[in-house]
């Protein structure tokens, strides 16, 4: 098991109060494979550095998880298939 930090940028038209519960459904992949979710932090709506899918703003969320590499890969795949997710970035924390 490794530590990861996942940043997700969501469609700005979503209601910010529904972001954490909707991310929680994706995080069941991590919990189902024996991983743990340390933190889910919703930063709120922020301006993007450049336009993504005709949006100039996005709702940022940062998630800290401890999981196997295959589990995180599956989570990233599922997030990428969701139309309300504009961009994801997975970083391994605590490496070396």
From Swiss-Prot:
InterPro entries in UniProt: Ribosomal_bS6, Ribosomal_bS6_CS, Ribosomal_bS6_sf, Ribosomal_S6_plastid/chlpt, Transl_elong_EF1B/ribsomal_bS6
Gene3D superfamilies registered for this protein in UniProt: 3.30.70.60
Pfam family, one: Ribosomal_S6
GO biological process terms, semicolon-separated: translation
Cellular component GO terms held in the UniProt record: cytoplasm; ribonucleoprotein complex; ribosome
CDD domains: bS6
Protein function: Binds together with bS18 to 16S ribosomal RNA.
Name this polypeptide is given: Small ribosomal subunit protein bS6
Organism: Mycobacteroides abscessus (strain ATCC 19977 / DSM 44196 / CCUG 20993 / CIP 104536 / JCM 13569 / NCTC 13031 / TMC 1543 / L948) (Mycobacterium abscessus)
């Amino acid at each position: 098991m490794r530590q990861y930090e996942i940043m997700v940028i969501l469609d700005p038209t979503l209601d910010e109060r529904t972001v954490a519960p909707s991310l929680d459904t994706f995080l069941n992949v991590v919990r189902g494979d024996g991983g743990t979710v340390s933190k889910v932090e919703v930063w709120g709506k922020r301006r993007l550095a450049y336009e993504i899918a005709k949006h100039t703003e996005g709702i940022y969320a940062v998630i800290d998880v401890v999981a196997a590499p295959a589990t995180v890969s599956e989570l990233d795949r599922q997030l990428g298939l969701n139309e309300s997710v504009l961009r994801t970035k997975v970083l391994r924390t605590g490496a070396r």
